[in-house]
Amino acid sequence: MKKKIAEYEVGEQVDLFLLIKTATKGIASNGKPFLTVILQDQSGDIEAKLWDVSPEVERQYTAETIVKVAGDIQNYKGRIQLRVKQIRVANPNEVTDISDFVEKAPVKKEDMVEKITQYIFEMRNPNIQRLTRHLLNKHQNDFLDYPAATKNHHEFVSGLAYHVVSMLDLAKAISTLYPSLDKDLLYAGVILHDLGKVIELSGPISTTYTLEGNLLGHISIMVNEIGKAAEELKIEGEEVLILQHIVLSHHGKAEWGSPKPPLVKEAEILHYIDNLDAKMNMMDRALGRTKPGEYTERVFALDNRSFYKPKFQTYYDK
């Protein structure tokens, strides 16, 4: 069985069909145009450069194009890259299904729906429960398909739902340790905090930002969605405002994208849970591609650090 792109090591030769996830134009120091392409299959993705490209080449190698690539894996300033020697657009008879090249969450959609539904069922506050169920039902199909981001963490098919399920399990464990937390608020905040991304982002494959995503962002989108849902369901009360605040503040600081800092206990905890799960996902995936006794490639979103994988640990190999 042929290896996937994430399984190749530095120095190895590559000859694979891959999907162009993104293609970004740049200008080199010599004034000539180049493309930075992110190539992916079900195992993950890798960056590559196409140098001295013509307008025709730019039109050929766009997002969602399947290509045949030959080259070798190299480490450039702590980042793993594919040095391209040959590349061409795949013929229709060579590959047929774009989903064969897309990374997916490791848990089935139906299992994630069942778990999230159970958490909603456990809510005792009827206003919080009705709002949460209404909004999830409204966006459920996209919620189960979309990634949680365009890059850095959970940026794969069903990544958004997988992120939420992990956060719900964290929220439950923390609530057991700190019983003064309002579980209804915390669970609802987890489920709703990133739900606006189904409007902010374009879809599960070659994900980009929509017009609404660029102009409003997922936080503002979901605050408005909560308000509209409350009107439709004729729900009045402080729960609506607090849920809006939890969504509004979940990034923690203005410089991280939240207009207000967390001013409710559950909002503060949600911010930490969100941050923890995102960082664990980034570290686990980087370490999963690393041999014991070696460092990961640099993880840009974690201060561009490389993480060491101790020789005595076998967790990531299981």
Curated annotation (Swiss-Prot):
CDD domains: HDc, YhaM_OBF_like. The keyword Protease does not apply. One of its GO terms (biological process) is rRNA 3'-end processing. The keyword Nuclease applies. Gene3D superfamilies: Hypothetical protein af1432, Nucleic acid-binding proteins. Belongs to the YhaM family. It is an enzyme of class 3 (hydrolase). GO terms for molecular function: 3'-5'-RNA exonuclease activity; nucleic acid binding. Keywords: Exonuclease, Hydrolase, Nuclease. This is 3'-5' exoribonuclease YhaM. Shows a 3'-5' exoribonuclease activity. Pfam families: HD (PF01966), tRNA_anti-codon (PF01336). The gene is yhaM. Its EC number is 3.1.-.-. Residues 163-279 form the HD domain.
